[in-house]
Amino acid sequence: MVDKRRPPSPRARYIGSQIYRGRPDARIVSSPRHAPNRYIDRPRAETMSFELHLQPPGPEARAVALKELRETEENVKQGILELKKYLEEDKTIYYKTDDDFLLIFLRPCKFYAKSAYDLMKRVAEFKEKNSSLFDNLMPADEKSAILENNVVNVLNGTDHKGRRVLLVNCGKTWDPSRVSADQILRLFYLVHEIAMLEPETQIFGTVVIMDFEALAMKQVLGFTRAFSMKLLTFIQDAMPLRLKEIHIVKQPFLFTMVWQMFKPFVREKLKKRMFFHGSKMASLHTHIPPSHLPKNYGGDLPEIDYTSADWYPTLIKNENKIKEWNSYGFRKEQ
């Protein structure tokens, strides 16, 4: 929230389309409803249609960026200059170098240019190693998986901390004979390509809710060791988004078999961000309040399905951005 008693800093200026200030005009303000989290309450998701929020970060986001990401005018300018230099010197990889695009990689790396450059190389390596899954991947390639198979959805709005929420149904509605685990990974990839375009999502990050209700052996067998390694490599090494939390809900005893497959590849940093709630929605609500969850998870919002009809048009609308992303990575030999 901006302190209106003070005039705007004369040092305020734009870098790309983002505004930065010489002093932190924004600060996090306690909310009576979410005082423990110290974040301003946000509109309930049901009041928002699914659309990308591409405007520059607001006061709350700028305050979080300053506190958590070292996002000062000086660090932004220096990070962009250094990252451009790394990319100019490396002739093996290709990414565009406009300021706003580079922020996608600098923000999760707290504006350390070398770390952002290393992330760009890992993204290129992941795409090359899994080219059969991701080369020229477009939304239409997975239209049926998205619209007809009730596996992946994205909440229309954000949660109370401004984070995008991805919902994955790995239980009763997932038929591995119709949508493979690798296809689920392709859906994740398409969603992340769009989510990372939002400046505030770059700052606030994302949350994943994985629903294992009525998990059966056909779903357990749908997960493979190879898939678990690919998924965790993507999440931990090659995703330029801040993954803040993963919530496992409604998991039966059979889930132990799935977890044993993934557990060896989960690093300590990710383990600390994973929460296992079972059927106790009150446990989930300590992280995301009912006001920002659908009825499926003890929330106040209407019950949802997983057809993804709300956000598929957003993918189609931004196909040009997805095509651009497909062109990035290691340069192809002529």
Regions found by a protein language model. Name each.
Residues 2-334:
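Basic, amphipathic alpha-helical/coil surface patches used to engage anionic, phosphate-bearing ligands
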